[in-house]
């Protein structure tokens, strides 16, 4: 395995002292990069992820080009679902489309048991390739969390309000619990397999869970998240686990009492306020990705965020959501350099 010579991200995830703030970006691999766009002229997303050499190349690009302190595996949260019998297609300009949406108990019952080594060996091979030969920074594996996956599976695709998902949850609580258990078991096994293959940390993306109230989260979602995190920690006690959601500041207190290591926040929450709500966790975030299209505002906001971030150990600079395709790659490089150079000065000042 290649030796990790830059462990800033891992130190920050453990709330240890660092000499500069680590940086990485959600959706840093692909999307805005010309090299990636050229590949997409020839291959679909799933075709890229099925070819370990190409997928590893895409994953490593932002490390080489932007100088980020961690790589995140290039794939989609939908990647494991075909292994459960879900007919999913990634449509350009739309996103994931499910051709056999969940509507009944029978639909849930038909979902197959997911075995990562059998269903997604190409994902594990990509991780091994990166960890063994290509990276000197930590590699982050990830999975979609059960609510977000269920929202696609029930709605049949992206949604603005998640009415069908929430009404299914309220109307069929027993069936919902079975669906959560199946997705939770898949997610735990998937994350453990990624760590076994060489991932240094894992992130749970619960992109749409902010649509739920805290009471509904505690009743319908928290049990499965606790199960996932507990199983991953039982298998890999020292591997950092990150929870990332959007518009979910009202759920921070729920995550404080789980064995998570890092909590990602978006631009609706300040770093200082987040620390008050999750004092035992490292914080990741929280630049609004829209500012990347307004360079002066971007650096102004980055400075404000940094001023809060450096006050205590356990801070990782990131966005509050993913990089847009329109973002110029040179802006990400400029921002990375700014965070590194400016944070080093601020940390020296103490």
Curated annotation (Swiss-Prot):
Give an example GO biological process.
protoporphyrinogen IX biosynthetic process
User: Where, per UniProt, does this protein localize?
Assistant: Cytoplasm
Q: Which keywords does the record carry? A: Cytoplasm, Decarboxylase, Lyase, Porphyrin biosynthesis
User: Mind telling me which Pfam families this protein's record contains?
Assistant: URO-D
One GO MF term on file is: uroporphyrinogen decarboxylase activity
Lineage: superkingdom: Bacteria
**GO CC, alphabetical:** cytosol
Please state the pathway this protein functions in, per its UniProt record.
Porphyrin-containing compound metabolism; protoporphyrin-IX biosynthesis; coproporphyrinogen-III from 5-aminolevulinate: step 4/4
Presence of keyword Zinc: no
Q: Where is this site: Transition state stabilizer?
A: 76
Q: Which reaction does it catalyse?
A: uroporphyrinogen III + 4 H(+) = coproporphyrinogen III + 4 CO2
Against InterPro entries, the record matches this protein to:
UROD/MetE-like_sf, Uroporphyrinogen_deCO2ase_HemE, Uroporphyrinogen_deCOase
Major place of residence: cytoplasm
User: Which EC number(s) are documented for this chain?
Assistant: 4.1.1.37
Report whether Cytoplasm shows up as a keyword of the record: yes
Kindly list the positions annotated as binding substrate.
27-31, 46, 76, 152, 207, 321
Functional description taken from the UniProt entry: Catalyzes the decarboxylation of four acetate groups of uroporphyrinogen-III to yield coproporphyrinogen-III.
Q: Tell me the protein family, please.
A: Belongs to the uroporphyrinogen decarboxylase family.
Q: Which HAMAP family match?
A: URO_D
Self-association and partners: Homodimer.
Q: What is this protein called?
A: Uroporphyrinogen decarboxylase
- Mind giving the lineage of the organism this protein is from? Bacteria, Bacillati, Bacillota, Bacilli, Bacillales
Q: Which gene encodes it?
A: hemE
């Amino acid at each position: 395995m290649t030796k990790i010579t830059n462990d800033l991200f891992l130190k920050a995830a453990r709330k240890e002292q660092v000499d500069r703030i680590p940086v990485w970006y959600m959706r840093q691999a692909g999307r805005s990069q010309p090299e990636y766009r050229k590949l997409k002229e020839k291959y679909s997303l799933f075709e890229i992820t099925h070819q370990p050499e190409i997928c590893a190349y895409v994953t490593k690009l932002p490390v080489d080009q932007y100088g980020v302190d961690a790589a995140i595996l290039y794939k989609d949260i939908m990647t494991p679902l075909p292994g459960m019998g879900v007919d999913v297609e990634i449509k350009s300009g739309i996103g994931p489309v499910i051709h056999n949406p969940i509507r009944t108990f029978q639909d849930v019952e038909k979902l197959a048991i997911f075995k990562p080594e059998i269903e997604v060996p190409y994902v594990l091979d990509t991780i091994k390739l990166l960890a063994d030969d290509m990276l000197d920074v930590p590699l982050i594996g990830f999975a979609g969390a059960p609510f977000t996956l269920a929202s696609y599976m029930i709605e049949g695709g992206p949604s603005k309000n998640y009415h069908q998902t929430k009404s299914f949850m309220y109307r069929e609580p027993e069936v919902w619990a079975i669906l959560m258990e199946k997705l939770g078991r898949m997610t735990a096994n998937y994350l453990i397999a990624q760590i076994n293959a060489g991932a240094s940390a894992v992130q749970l993306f619960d992109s749409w869970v902010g649509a739920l109230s805290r009471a509904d989260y505690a009743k319908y979602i928290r049990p499965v998240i606790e199960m996932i995190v507990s199983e991953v920690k039982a298998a890999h006690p020292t591997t950092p686990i990150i929870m990332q959601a959007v518009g979910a500041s009202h759920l921070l207190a729920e995550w404080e009492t789980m064995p998570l290591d890092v909590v990602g926040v978006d631009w609706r929450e300040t770093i200082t306020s987040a620390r008050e709500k999750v004092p035992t966790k490292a914080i990741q975030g929280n630049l609004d990705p829209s500012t990347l299209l307004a360079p002066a505002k971007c650096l102004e906001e980055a400075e404000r965020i940094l001023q809060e971030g450096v006050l205590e150990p356990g801070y990782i600079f990131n966005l509050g959501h993913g990089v847009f395709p329109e973002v110029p790659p040179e802006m990400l490089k400029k921002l990375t350099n700014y965070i590194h150079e400016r944070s080093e000065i601020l940390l020296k000042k103490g």
